[in-house]
Amino acid sequence: MKKIVAVIFVIIILLVSAIYLLIPATLIVSSISTINVTENAYRKFIIDNNTNWQKWWPSFTTTTENLNYKNYQFKIINKNINVVEIAAINDQDTIYTKLILAPLKTDTINVIWTTHFSTGSNPLKKVQTYQKAKELKSHFTELLNSMKKFLENDEAIYSFKIEKTKVNDPLLLSSKFKTHNYPTTTEIYKVIKELKDQIVLKDIKETGNPMLHVRMLDSSNYETMVAIPINKEILFDNKFAIKKMILGNLLVTDVKGGVANIQKAYDALDTYILDHRLISPAMPYESLITNRILESDTSKWESKVYYPIF
């Protein structure tokens, strides 16, 4: 019997020793996620505006004041340039945590969600605190995974799916005209017809859809350039001009809808370029997929918006 008691005592001593050896007085809990997103986009959706948290939070929430996840309620309590301070609250505790931004390069960041626990001197409390820390670390990881999935989706960030492509039709037959208001569809397609007539007259071929760029000169005057990609360069009269695009890179997005939706696409590409610190060497333009003169319902118009970049 004494031997059994002695063995139990030794086991207890070993267990307690192991607890003190393996669980430090201060337990740091961190989860790190590498996210392919720009610093600007992260700030917009995570730091600058609390309402954007609902868009990526994995459990349903109607408010950003208290974000529930499993057995915790997460509450944003403070923010600065790179850190969001968040209280993780359950029935027993309020744990103060930090969400830290660590930029790596133009389009990649690390996000660290971290906190620390004082485990005390009581072995039982140490084990309980360790289990609590392990659970919270799992929550951090799951929440960061949800954030990563959202932030790496360009369509979620910019409202359009943005892709990179190359200039395939560098040679253009173009013409410009000015109007006192935004050009009408009739005015645009009048010039497109003139270009098409010249293409037939000169016995050359179209290699792509009509292209359009409208520039506001002042509050009531616009300059419009219309172009059609062609297969070879020949001479035209002064009303028409041959333009040569640089064989470089383009951003492109598909747009469905009229002028207002197309302008939103231009704005989204402007923001994308700013976020990714790109430079545009030439003017953006839209490619007219739908023949707008034949389709009066602008909600059915299909276009592509292109932005040259390097």
List each model region and its residues:
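Extracytosolic and intramembrane catalytic regions of membrane-associated proteins
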Residues: 83-85, 96
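A structural signal for short, hydrophobic beta-strand segments that form beta-sheets
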Residues: 71-78
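Hydrophobic membrane-insertion alpha-helices, especially the h-region
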Residues: 4-21
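Short acidic/polar N-terminal linker immediately downstream of export determinants
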Residues: 23-29
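Ser/Thr- and Asn-enriched, surface-exposed coil loops between beta-strands
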Residues: 80-83, 105-107
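Short, well-ordered beta-strand elements within core beta-sheets of diverse protein domains
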Residues: 29-36
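A solvent-exposed interaction/effector surface
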Residues: 17, 23, 36-39, 43-47, ...
